C-alpha cells in the first residue's frame, strides 16, 4: 500500500479536530490529542449514526495540574507518521541519521530573508526507515549508539548545503571535525561627516549609500498568545539529595552564593515539564531513562555558572537575577551550562540530558516571547553548538532562526530601547527600568555574537544581520556590575567612561574611516567589534590594521578572563584572514580526497611564497595556541580556536620554504607571546630559530608530533566543553593518516 493511500485511509478515521489540524489521531473516543489539549473530540461517522460528541479527559490523563500545563508542554507537530525512535543509552554522541528518499519542498522565513529549498517528495517508506514530516530516515545499527533520541520535533528535513556550498572544490563542512560522525550532505555543498578623514575602506561609502536595513524595532504583527498557567503540579518525583561524603564536600566548595537559590516551586515546574517531555505519547518519545538532577545539584550548577562562565559571557545581570517560578526556563538554561564546570560527581554526564530537555522546553513555548525565554535560547544555542553531538549542532543551526524571531518580537513590543541611553531622564526612571532596557540590548547583541561566531568558526550562513542592531552597544562592565541602585547612580554621576556608546555599525564605521575607537570601550564591546570586523571581512582591505588597533586597546584593559578571551578572538579572526576555515579543516585531511588535499596544499604553498603573510599567520596561530594552553577562560570558542591554531601551525611549519643554513648559530625566538621582537621578525626577513612552549623548536624533526599530541591532550583533558573531547581523537587520527600517506 502506498503512502498516499495509507494517508487517505488514516485521515478518514481521524476525529474532526485532528483531521482539521492534520494531526495524528489514535482513533480512541476521546483521542489522546483531544484529551491532552482538552478539546471536543467528535467523529463524523459517529454523528451520522446519531451519537453525541464527546468531551472530557482521557481516563489516563492526570488531574487539573496536568491540564494547566497542557498548552505549554505539548508541541505542535504536523504531518508526522510516527516518532523517530532512537536508543537512550548514556553515551553523549551518536552519528546522525542519513536522509534517504526525496524530501519535500521547504520554505523558511528567517528574519527578513526568505529562503526556499525545492526538493521533490519521496514516495516510499523503507522497512528499516522512519518517516518524519514526509522525510524518510534510514536507521542503522550505528544510529542506535546515541545517549537519547531527539524526538520528532527535530528539523531533520532541512539540508545544510546553504552553509556548505563551495564553488572551488567542495571542501567539507568545518563543523564536521568537532563531532563523532558527520552526517552526509543532501546536496552541494549614520556617521557624521568630519572634515579630512583618513584613507578609508571602499565599503564605508557603500554602506552609507545603501538603503537602510529594517531593524529589530520595526513593528511586527504579534498574535496574542495564551499566558502560562500559574498552577503547579501536585505530582512530584522523588529525588535523593546528595549523600556521598565526597560529593557533599564538592557541593560545599562550590556554594559560591552569587545568586539566590532556585526555590522549590520553580523546581517542581521543571520536574513536571521534564516528565511531560520525557514521556511516551503521540507528541514526543522518551529521550532518557535518568531523572532530572536534584534541586541541590541544580543550585550547585547555577552558582558555578556565575563563577566560571558569566564573567566571560555577561548576558545576565547578576545583581537582579532571581531564579523564581516564572523564569524557571532561564534557571534551567543557566544550570545546564554550569554543570560543565562543576566538580561534583557525574555533573558532566547530565549535560546532554539537560540540553535536550531545555531544547524541547523552549520549542513548546507558545506565550508571547519574554526576555528570560530568549536568554535561555541563547544559552541553549551555545550548549548545542559546542556540545559535541552532531545532532545538537544541526539543531542549533536550525533553531537560530527561532531565536532571531524571539528577539524581533521582544524588540518590536519594547518601550525600553528608546530610553536605554545613559542620561538624567533614564536615571530618574529608576534602576530596575534601566536594567530591563540593558538586558534587552545585551540579549540582542549576545544572540548576534553567538551567530557571528558560528559563521566564523563553522562557516555557517549568517542568520542575524549586523545592521539589525540599530540601538546602542551595551553599557560598560563597571556600571553593569553595580549591585545596588545607590552605587549605580553614583557611578553614572562620577564616571565619565560610563556614557553609552552608539550602535555597533556606527562604531565600526568610525574605526574604518578614522582608525580609532571610543575611549570608554571595554572588553565585551571590544569582542563585539572583533566579530563586526569578521562580519565585514570580505569587503575590507585593511582588516588586519583594525584588529591591531583593537588589540592595542584591549592590552590596556584589566587582565580579566574576558580580556584574554577577546585577545584569543582577535588572533583567531586575524588568522582567518590568511587561512580560511574550510582550508584549515581540509588540510587536516578530514573527509577530503587526495585530490582535494593536494589542491589545498598547492594553494597553501603558493600563498606561503609571501613570507610576511606566512609569518604573520604563524604568529597569530602560535598566540592562540599558547593563550588557550596557558590561560584557559572556559569560553566556548576555545575548542575550535585551539584546533584551528594547531592545524595552521602544522601546515605552516611542514610547508615552510625558509631554508636556514647553520641554524644552530641563529638566535631563538619564542612565539609564546606577541612581543616587539616577534612583531619585528614577522615584518622583516631576519632568520630565527622558532620556539613554542610545550612543543620546542618548530624546526625539530619531532616538533609536529609533539604539537599534535599536546593539542589532543589539551582538548581531551583540559577543556570543559564536550566539543573538545570529540575533537582530540579526530586530530590524532588525521595526523596519523597524513604520516601514513607521506
UniProtKB/Swiss-Prot annotation:
Keyword field: DNA-binding, Metal-binding, Nucleus, Transcription, Transcription regulation, Zinc
Single annotated GO MF? zinc ion binding
| Compartment annotation | Nucleus
Q: Provide ranges: composition bias, Polar residues.
A: 218-240
Question: Where is the DNA-binding region?
Answer: 15-41
- Region (Disordered) spans which residues? 50-80, 218-244
| Reported phenotype of the disruption mutant | Does not affect the expression of expression of DMATS1, FFUJ_09176,and FFUJ_09178; nor the metabolite production.
Q: Which InterPro entries match?
A: Transcription_factor_dom_fun (IPR007219), Zn2-C6_fun-type_DNA-bd_sf (IPR036864), Zn2Cys6_DnaBD (IPR001138)
The UniProt entry, under Pfam families, shows: Fungal_trans, Zn_clus
Gene Ontology terms: cellular component? nucleus
Kindly report the protein's main subcellular placement as a broad class: nucleus
* Induction context: Expression is negaticely regulated by the global nitrogen regulator areA.
In terms of superkingdom, the source organism counts as: Eukaryota
**What are its GO biological-process terms?**
DNA-templated transcription
Record's function text = Transcription factor; part of the DMATS1 gene cluster that mediates the biosynthesis of a reversely N-prenylated monomeric L-tryptophan (r-N-DMAT). Seems not to regulate the expression of the DMATS1 cluster.
Q: What's this protein's name?
A: Transcription factor FFUJ_09177
Q: Which organism is it from?
A: Gibberella fujikuroi (strain CBS 195.34 / IMI 58289 / NRRL A-6831)
Amino acid at each position: 500500500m502506498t503512502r498516499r493511500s495509507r494517508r487517505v485511509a488514516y485521515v478518514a478515521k481521524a476525529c474532526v479536530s485532528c483531521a482539521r489540524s492534520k494531526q495524528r489521531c489514535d482513533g480512541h473516543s476521546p483521542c489522546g490529542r483531544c484529551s491532552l489539549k482538552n478539546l471536543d473530540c467528535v467523529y463524523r461517522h459517529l454523528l451520522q449514526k446519531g451519537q453525541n460528541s464527546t468531551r472530557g479527559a482521557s481516563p489516563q490523563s492526570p488531574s487539573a495540574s496536568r491540564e494547566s500545563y497542557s498548552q505549554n508542554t505539548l508541541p505542535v507537530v504536523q504531518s508526522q507518521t510516527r516518532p523517530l525512535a532512537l536508543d537512550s543509552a548514556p553515551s553523549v554522541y551518536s552519528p546522525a541519521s542519513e536522509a534517504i528518499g526525496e524530501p519535500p519542498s521547504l520554505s523558511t522565513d528567517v528574519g527578513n530573508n526568505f529562503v526556499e529549498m525545492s526538493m521533490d517528495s519521496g514516495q516510499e517508506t523503507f522497512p528499516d526507515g522512519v518517516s518524519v514530516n514526509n522525510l524518510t530516515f534510514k536507521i542503522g545499527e550505528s544510529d542506535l549508539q546515541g545517549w537519547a533520541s531527539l524526538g520528532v520535533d527535530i528539523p531533520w528535513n532541512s539540508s545544510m548545503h546553504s552553509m556548505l556550498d563551495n564553488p572551488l572544490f567542495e571542501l567539507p563542512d568545518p563543523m564536521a571535525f568537532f563531532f563523532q560522525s558527520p552526517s552526509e550532505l543532501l546536496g552541494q555543498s549614520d556617521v557624521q561627516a568630519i572634515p579630512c578623514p583618513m584613507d578609508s575602506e571602499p565599503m564605508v561609502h557603500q554602506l552609507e549609500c545603501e538603503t537602510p536595513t529594517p531593524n529589530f524595532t520595526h513593528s511586527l504583527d504579534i498574535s496574542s498568545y495564551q499566558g502560562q498557567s500559574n498552577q503547579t503540579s501536585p505530582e512530584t518525583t522523588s529525588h535523593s539529595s546528595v549523600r556521598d561524603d565526597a560529593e557533599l564536600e564538592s557541593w560545599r566548595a562550590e556554594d559560591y552564593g552569587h545568586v539566590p537559590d532556585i526555590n522549590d516551586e520553580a523546581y517542581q515546574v521543571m520536574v513536571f515539564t521534564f516528565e511531560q517531555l520525557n514521556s511516551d505519547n503521540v507528541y514526543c518519545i522518551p529521550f532518557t531513562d535518568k531523572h532530572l538532577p536534584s534541586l541541590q545539584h541544580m543550585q550547585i550548577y547555577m552558582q558555578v555558572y556565575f563563577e566560571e562562565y558569566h564573567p566571560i559571557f555577561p548576558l545576565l545581570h547578576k545583581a537582579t537575577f532571581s531564579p523564581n517560578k516564572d523564569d524557571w526556563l532561564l534557571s534551567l538554561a543557566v544550570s545546564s551550562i554550569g554543570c560543565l564546570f562543576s566538580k561534583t560527581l557525574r555533573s558532566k554526564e547530565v549535560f546532554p540530558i539537560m540540553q535536550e530537555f531545555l531544547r524541547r522546553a523552549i520549542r513548546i513555548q507558545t506565550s508571547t516571547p519574554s526576555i528570560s525565554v530568549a536568554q535561555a535560547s541563547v544559552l541553549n544555542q551555545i550548549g548545542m553548538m559546542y556540545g559535541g553531538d552532531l545532532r545538537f549542532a544541526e539543531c542549533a543551526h536550525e533553531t537560530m532562526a527561532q531565536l532571531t524571531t524571539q528577539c524581533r518580537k521582544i524588540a518590536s513590543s519594547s518601550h525600553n530601547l528608546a530610553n536605554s541611553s545613559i542620561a538624567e531622564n533614564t536615571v530618574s526612571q529608576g534602576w530596575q527600568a534601566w536594567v530591563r532596557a540593558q538586558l534587552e540590548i545585551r540579549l540582542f547583541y549576545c544572540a548576534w555574537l553567538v551567530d557571528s561566531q558560528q559563521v566564523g568558526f563553522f562557516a555557517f550562513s549568517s542568520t542575524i544581520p549586523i545592521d539589525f542592531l540599530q540601538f546602542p552597544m551595551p553599557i560598560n562592565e563597571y556600571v553593569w556590575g553595580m549591585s545596588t541602585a545607590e552605587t549605580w547612580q553614583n557611578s553614572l554621576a562620577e564616571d565619565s567612561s560610563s556614557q553609552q556608546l552608539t550602535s555597533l555599525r556606527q562604531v565600526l564605521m568610525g574605526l574604518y574611516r578614522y582608525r580609532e575607537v571610543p575611549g570608554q570601550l571595554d572588553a565585551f564591546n571590544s569582542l563585539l567589534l572583533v566579530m563586526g570586523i569578521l562580519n565585514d571581512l570580505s569587503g575590507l582591505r585593511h582588516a588586519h590594521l583594525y584588529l591591531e588597533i583593537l588589540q592595542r586597546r584591549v592590552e590596556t584593559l584589566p587582565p580579566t578572563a574576558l580580556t584574554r578571551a577577546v585577545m584569543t578572538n582577535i588572533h583567531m579572526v586575524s588568522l582567518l584572514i590568511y587561512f580560511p576555515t574550510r582550508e584549515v579543516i581540509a588540510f587536516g585531511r578530514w573527509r577530503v580526497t587526495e585530490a582535494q588535499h593536494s589542491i589545498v596544499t598547492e594553494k597553501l604553498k603558493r600563498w606561503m611564497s609571501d613570507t610576511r603573510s606566512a609569518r604573520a599567520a604563524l604568529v597569530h596561530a602560535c598566540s592562540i595556541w599558547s593563550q588557550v594552553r596557558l590561560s584557559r577562560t572556559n569560553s566556548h570558542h576555545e575548542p575550535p580556536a585551539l584546533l584551528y591554531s594547531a592545524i595552521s601551525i602544522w601546515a605552516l611549519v611542514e610547508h615552510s620554504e625558509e631554508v636556514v643554513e647553520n641554524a644552530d648559530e641563529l638566535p631563538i625566538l619564542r612565539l609564546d607571546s606577541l612581543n616587539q621582537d616577534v612583531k619585528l621578525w614577522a615584518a622583516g626577513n631576519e632568520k630565527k630559530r622558532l620556539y613554542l612552549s610545550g612543543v620546542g623548536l618548530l624546526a625539530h624533526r619531532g616538533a609536529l608530533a609533539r604539537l599534535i599530541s599536546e593539542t589532543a591532550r589539551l582538548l581531551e583533558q583540559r577543556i570543559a566543553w564536550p566539543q573538545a573531547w570529540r575533537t582530540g581523537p579526530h586530530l590524532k587520527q588525521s595526523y596519523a593518516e597524513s604520516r601514513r600517506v607521506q
